Each structure stands twice: as C-alpha cells, then as structure tokens.
Amino acid sequence: MTNAMHLIATPAYKTCARGLFLILIITLTGCALKASSVSPSLYDFGPGRLSSRAEAAPARAPQAPALHPLIVADIEASPALEGNAVLYRLAYADAQQLKPYAQARWSMAPAQLVRQRLREHLGQSRTLLNPGDSVGQGSAAPLTLRLELEEFSQLFDTPATSVGLLRLRVTVVQAHNASEQTLAQRMVVVQRPAASADAAGGVRALTAATDAAIQEIDAWLQTLAL
C-alpha cells in the first residue's frame, strides 16, 4: 500500500515541480521583455520661437548697412558627437572618457540641433542660405559660416555638481577664384550649470550653453560688419 502511494505521489510531485518551473520561466521572461521595451527619453532644445513677430530689441540705426546674406554650412563634429547619445564626463574620476546615458537620447545629432538653433536666431536679422543655393548674377559671393563642434557634454566636477559644456570653432569664409578665403575665425567656449545631476539637467544646461554661444557668435559677426 505504501509503495502504491509512493508511486502515485512521485509523478504528482514532478508535475507540480515542472509547473512551478514553467511559471518561473514565464515570469522572468516577461520581466526581461518589459525591461527591454522601455524606450529612452528623447530630448531636443525645445519648441523654439512661438511667434513670428520680432522680439523687442533696440532698433538699428537708419544708416547702418544691411547685414550680408550668410550661408550656414552643415556643422562638422568629432566622431564621438555624430550619434544621438546624451554624453557626460566625470572630471573627478576620468575626464578623458565620454560616457553615454543609457536612457537618454537627442532627437537628432547635436550638430544638427545646434545648426537648427543657430539658423533660427540669425535668420531674424539677415538672409540665410543653404550650401548650394544660387545667388543673383553679378552679386558678390555670399559669406559662409563654418562651425566645428568639438565638445558637447555634461561635465561633472563632483557626483552632485555639473555643467553643460559646449566648444565651437567658428570660421567665416568667402569663395574666391575657385577657393575659399578665410575672413575671420574664433573659438567659442560656453558652460552653463546643470540644475540636476542627471540627463535632464544636462540637456537643459547644454540648451542654455548653446543659446549663449549663438548670442556670442551673432555679436561677433556684427562687430566684423558681416
């Protein structure tokens, strides 16, 4: 009798164990699929101008000449900045290493975001052209603004404090006899504090740094009467 009960209990135990094992596998698989399906947060510089009206600003003197039309070339960037990752550095540990946030992405490459923001600002006061746009016959060759994005990251001085750091090399050139003549060049380096030690704080700081850099570039171009 005991042997018979044992023979009946053994298959039942094995069946129960297999059922529990399958439930465990299904649960773990579901958790893994849920974790892998979490999409990273997508960031840009915000909606930009919300009105077509010019912002209130000091009027230009009547005798001031019109600003030259300007070609804004595609911004060149180092290979590390060609992707969409939101990058940071730990200056207190290894400042030479760029690291990406796992769950944060730019909506497009940083160089494209910077160019878009630059055109939005400069276009308020002058005619902007794209590379390859034609100009009227007899007109002087338009000036070209070239930019190289060398740094665009959140730099942590400590685990709790950081800044958005942007570094741009800006060059103004003009076509001359099938070549380009450099008219002016400068380096623009801007940093703005991050309000929080995370990707969202870094994005806001880099947006502020970009806007400040663009203001600096615009003011510089006007001092050159370009």
Where are the regions a protein language model picked out?
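C-terminal motif of bacterial Sec signal peptides marking the signal peptidase cleavage site
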Residues: 27-30
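A structural "domain/chain start" motif
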Residues: 32-112, 224-226
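Surface-exposed short loop/turn segments
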Residues: 34-52, 125-178
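Short secondary-structure boundary motifs at beta->alpha junctions and helix caps
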Residues: 97-104, 176-219
